[in-house]
């Protein structure tokens, strides 16, 4: 195998927009993310309501055949 062809790994601090942070290994020393396991609805069990009724009405209004 060839030597010195792989990127150098350093300890990386990953920070989420919710304030959660954790350590990982990466080529960069710092990363910022928008969503993590502490604030993602799948992991927290909370649901986010989506206004699908408004979208359906808008679709029907746009493509209504008179």
UniProtKB/Swiss-Prot annotation:
Family annotation (Pfam families): Ribosomal_L31
GO term, biological process aspect, one: translation
Keywords of this entry: Metal-binding, Ribonucleoprotein, Ribosomal protein, RNA-binding, rRNA-binding, Zinc
Entry binding sites for Zn(2+): 16, 18, 36, 39
Molecular function per GO: metal ion binding; rRNA binding; structural constituent of ribosome
NCBIfam families for the chain: L31, PRK00019.1, PRK00528.1
Quaternary data: Part of the 50S ribosomal subunit.
Function comment: Binds the 23S rRNA.
Name the UniProt record assigns to this protein: Large ribosomal subunit protein bL31
Gene that encodes it: rpmE
């Amino acid at each position: 195998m060839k030597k010195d062809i792989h990127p150098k790994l350093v300890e990386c601090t990953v920070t989420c927009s919710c304030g959660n942070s954790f350590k990982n290994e990466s080529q960069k020393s710092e990363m910022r993310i928008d969503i993590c396991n502490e604030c993602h609805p799948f992991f927290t069990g909370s649901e986010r309501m989506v206004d699908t009724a408004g979208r359906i009405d808008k679709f029907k209004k746009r493509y209504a055949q008179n």
